[in-house]
A protein has these predicted regions:
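Active-site/acyl-donor-binding loops of N-acyltransferases
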Residues: 2-9, 58, 76, 130-156, ...
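A conserved beta-strand-loop-helix scaffold within acyl/acetyltransferase catalytic domains
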Residues: 6, 10-65, 72-82, 128-257
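Short loop/turn motifs at secondary-structure junctions
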Residues: 55, 120-122, 276
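Aromatic (often tryptophan-rich) hydrophobic motifs at membrane interfaces
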Residues: 59-63, 68-71, 81, 92, ...
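Conserved acyl-donor/pantetheine-binding loop and adjacent beta-alpha core of acyl/acetyltransferases
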Residues: 75-95
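Short intrinsically disordered coil segments
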Residues: 89, 159-168, 321-328
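Acyl-group handling in specialized metabolite and lipid biosynthesis
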Residues: 96-99, 147
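Non-catalytic accessory segments adjacent to catalytic cores
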Residues: 103-145
Length: 354
């Protein structure tokens, strides 16, 4: 049943994502909107709710005739360590307000702020989308996006990679690596969990990865690099309107020497092209990090991501950034944890990061 949120002329409500017809209608509208992302889809909100036990509040604005005028997928994030926040889109690198006109943008922004107050979430964070207006802080310096077109064929793709990185990819060809695509979720999770532990950050719950694969169906898959039958690197990717999003990728201890990550991303470019994709979205990275430098080495030009936050006057907005000096001790300690301990504790912490 659809619950009214506020009495406003534009007709704002919280969508019933349990209704398949409602999901299909919203998904079609997002797909048709020029600024839509996979993180605006009902499938993403549902997967996050199921995989991380964080409640979804998917705002939809409708005109008097019932036509959709805008959406704002919000996730209610609660964490005993990091506090409460309302985030769009939870666990996504994109999201924010998607609307047809400025008036609807303003209505959705006001509704998000009111929803945050009602849910006792002192911080509301919008990751991209239309500018919500006065009262919101804008951050265009923390995160960078890396997107470029895919080449017409495999040889052209290899030549599109700058010389130094291209040499690394070529070296990987001689390391007896094999590539498989499909749904080896167990191997992927094990490799991803090891890689984020090595970076000093907690791993997301296994249930989140399973929920995303289930919700996106054929629009998501796992590509794994093996060496003599053993998985050494793996990535879970989303496919949306001709773009591949390698979203969660990582490798084990053997990956560096085998250049498995180099092999993995080149193989994903080839795989995505075979699926009909024309663009490769390498995701976001924090400015000034090794991850950002790695993507630039592949020939991707960084573009700043614009995020918006709002908190009550005099209250600091929630900030969860492992590069913040106040987390440096925790990051160093996490890197030293045995993998079994990191995998046991990590999901409990990470499901509250959002």
């Amino acid at each position: 049943m659809n619950a009214p949120l506020l009495t406003r002329p534009v007709g704002l409500r919280i969508a019933d994502l349990g209704d398949a017809i409602e999901r299909a209608r919203l998904g079609a509208w997002v797909h048709a909107h020029a600024e839509g992302t996979p993180f605006h889809l009902p499938a993403w909100s549902m997967a996050v709710a199921r995989g991380c036990r964080q409640k979804s509040h998917y705002l939809v604005a409708e005109r008097g005739n019932g036509d959709i005028a805008g959406v704002l997928p919000l996730t209610e994030i609660h964490s005993p360590l990091f506090g409460r926040a309302l985030v769009s889109a939870g666990f996504g690198v994109g999201g924010g307000i998607l609307a047809d006109n400025p008036a609807t943008v303003a209505e959705l922004a006001a509704a998000a702020w009111a929803c945050g107050a009602r849910l006792s979430c002192p911080t509301v964070e919008l990751r991209g989308g239309a500018h919500p207006g006065a009262g919101w802080q804008v951050d265009e310096t923390t995160y960078l996006s890396f997107v470029r077109a895919l080449a017409a064929d495999d040889e052209a793709e290899l030549l599109a990679i700058p010389r130094k990185q291209r040499a690394e990819v070529r070296r990987s060809f001689g390391n007896a690596l094999t590539i498989e695509t499909g749904g080896d979720a167990a191997t992927h999770y094990a490799l991803y969990a090891e890689s984020v532990r090595n970076l000093g950050t907690p791993v997301f719950p296994r249930a989140l990865f399973a929920a995303v694969l289930d919700a996106f169906g054929d629009a998501a898959d796992v590509l794994t690099v093996r060496h003599r039958g053993v998985g050494v690197a793996s990535v879970l990717s989303l496919y949306w309107r001709g773009t591949v999003y390698p979203y969660w990728g990582g490798g084990g201890d053997a990956a560096r020497a085998l250049r498995a990550n180099d092999a993995m991303y080149f193989a994903l470019m080839r795989h995505a092209h075979a699926r009909g994709c024309t663009r490769f979205d390498f995701g976001r990275s924090k400015a000034g990090t090794g991850a950002a430098a790695f993507k630039k080495n592949w020939g991707f030009e960084p573009e700043p991501l614009r995020y918006f936050t709002r908190a009550p006057e005099g209250v600091a907005a929630r900030k969860v950034n492992p590069l913040d000096p106040k987390y440096s001790l925790q990051v160093r300690a996490w890197k030293r944890l045995p993998l079994w301990a990191a995998n046991r504790l990590g999901p409990w912490i990470a499901q509250g990061l959002g």
